[in-house]
């Protein structure tokens, strides 16, 4: 039986309703020469086996992260994800579930969201966390908007160590909200004067640690300076594993902590989906964007979980909403929660220690290569080196040898005089042989 979605009578009635004589009239804004009159000459359909082989040939052109020594970071990190994480999140109760608007049938989802919030608050040293954002960049953008609401001021200062993609999200939002954004020049060694830029118009100071170049920052002096000026300090991170070893931003005085949670429980995923983390102090709770899961008692006095304080535009008047983000990264935050639960506090610290040790070992080896200059003094699992010549050329040459060497800074900051800089990350997945291969290949490439 054929499926006929539209009869001639249906078409005539619809055209009459919208007031046009023909279907072609609906497309009159498109130049006639640009319209597709006949179907293109596409190849005939293929069987499943043929399609799989064709796609396999295409994918074989890529140098996969799993098939080569991989030192790429700059905001997305390759970590080992236990098989149990993927197995559990693929259960249909999690994989296919929708927003838990009906708590009486969604206690499982609500409970893991509550546990996720608890873990994020503990990791960041804050008092409350939301149910996640799209990713670290959108969390940063929402944090800046939250700071504007809280302080009634309209200027944000972005550190020169903030990931350029995060800065682009903030400036894109500011173009529509009318707020001012001051983006500091690239700060390769975390030595910029941020305190001197604070004034009575500043709502927030946004500082990343570890920053995009790998530098670790002491946030306490910045937090003290911000308090004196009535400015909110927003601490950003892109590598969540660092929180297993580095002092929590909240414990250093940050007012809002945001970042990317991809490196716990989530694979690289071609750049997404990821999971944005957002935490703050209890006194700012009502201006925190996104969803919040709370614990309560039901009519029979039993412990239960519900969505609470959802001041999104779906729930209240748009002009009163704290955010127009319409969802959270539910499955990704479940993966985060499962992995972190499996690790535990000691496991996370051990994982972070291994990451740091691998990075220090690699940095020491590379610093001994003639022509290589290490720019960082303190770092976690990522650092920046200066090379003779264009870093992009060296990366391409090493990729041809089967080594993914890192991210040229010129890709993140084109035209900023950073052509000779390379960001390198080393995590627990990089073996001693991997690190030795990178050092040897780069030394030969430079010689």
UniProtKB/Swiss-Prot annotation:
One of its GO terms (molecular function) is glycine dehydrogenase (decarboxylating) activity. Gene3D superfamilies: Aspartate Aminotransferase, domain 1 (3.90.1150.10), Type I PLP-dependent aspartate aminotransferase-like (Major domain) (3.40.640.10). The glycine cleavage system catalyzes the degradation of glycine. The P protein binds the alpha-amino group of glycine through its pyridoxal phosphate cofactor; CO(2) is released and the remaining methylamine moiety is then transferred to the lipoamide cofactor of the H protein. This is Probable glycine dehydrogenase (decarboxylating) subunit 1. Keywords: Oxidoreductase. Its EC number is 1.4.4.2. The lineage of its organism: Bacteria, Pseudomonadati, Pseudomonadota, Alphaproteobacteria, Hyphomicrobiales. It catalyses: N(6)-[(R)-lipoyl]-L-lysyl-[glycine-cleavage complex H protein] + glycine + H(+) = N(6)-[(R)-S(8)-aminomethyldihydrolipoyl]-L-lysyl-[glycine-cleavage complex H protein] + CO2. PANTHER family: GLYCINE CLEAVAGE SYSTEM P-PROTEIN, GLYCINE DEHYDROGENASE (DECARBOXYLATING). Belongs to the GcvP family. N-terminal subunit subfamily. The glycine cleavage system is composed of four proteins: P, T, L and H. In this organism, the P 'protein' is a heterodimer of two subunits. It comes from the Bacteria. GO terms for biological process: glycine decarboxylation via glycine cleavage system; nucleoside metabolic process. HAMAP family: GcvPA (MF_00712).
């Amino acid at each position: 039986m054929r499926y006929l979605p539209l009869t001639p009578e249906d078409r005539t009635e619809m055209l009459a309703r919208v007031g046009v004589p023909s279907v072609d009239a609906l497309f009159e804004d498109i130049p006639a020469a640009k319209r597709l009159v006949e179907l293109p000459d596409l190849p005939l359909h293929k069987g499943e086996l043929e399609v799989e082989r064709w796609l396999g040939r295409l994918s074989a052109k890529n140098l996969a992260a799993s098939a080569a020594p991989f030192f790429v970071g700059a905001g997305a990190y390759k970590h080992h994800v236990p098989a149990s994480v993927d197995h559990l999140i693929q259960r249909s109760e999690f994989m296919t579930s929708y927003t838990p608007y009906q708590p009486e049938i969604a206690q499982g989802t609500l409970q893991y969201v509550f546990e996720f919030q608890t873990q994020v608050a503990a990791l960041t040293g804050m008092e409350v966390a939301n149910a996640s954002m799209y990713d670290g960049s959108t969390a940063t953008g929402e944090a800046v908007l939250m700071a504007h609401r809280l302080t009634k001021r309209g200027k944000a200062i972005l550190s020169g160590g903030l990931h350029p993609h995060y800065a682009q999200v903030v400036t894109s939002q500011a173009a529509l909200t009318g707020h001012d954004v001051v983006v500091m020049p690239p700060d390769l060694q975390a030595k910029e004067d941020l305190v001197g830029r604070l004034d009575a118009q500043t709502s927030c100071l946004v500082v990343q640690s570890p920053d995009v170049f790998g530098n670790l920052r002491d946030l306490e002096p910045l937090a003290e300076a911000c308090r004196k000026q009535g400015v909110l300090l927003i601490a950003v991170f892109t590598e969540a594993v660092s929180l297993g070893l580095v002092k929590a931003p909240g414990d250093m005085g940050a007012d809002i902590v945001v970042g990317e949670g991809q490196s716990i429980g989530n694979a690289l995923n071609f750049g997404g989906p990821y999971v944005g983390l957002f935490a703050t102090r209890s006194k700012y709770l009502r201006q925190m964007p996104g969803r919040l899961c709370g614990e309560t008692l039901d009519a029979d006095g039993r412990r239960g979980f519900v969505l609470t304080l959802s001041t999104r535009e779906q729930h209240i008047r748009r002009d009163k909403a704290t955010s127009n983000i319409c969802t959270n990264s539910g499955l990704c935050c479940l993966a985060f929660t499962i992995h972190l639960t499996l690790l535990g506090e000691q496991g996370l610290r051990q994982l972070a220690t291994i990451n740091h040790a691998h990075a220090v070992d690699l940095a020491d080896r590379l610093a001994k290569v003639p022509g290589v200059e290490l720019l960082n003094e303190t770092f976690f699992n990522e650092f920046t080196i200066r090379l003779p010549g264009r870093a992009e050329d060296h990366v391409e040459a090493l990729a041809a040898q089967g080594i993914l060497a890192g991210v040229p800074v010129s890709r993140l900051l084109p035209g900023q005089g950073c052509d000779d800089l390379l960001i390198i990350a080393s995590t627990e997945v990089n073996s001693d042989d991997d690190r030795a291969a990178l050092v040897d290949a780069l030394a030969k490439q430079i010689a």
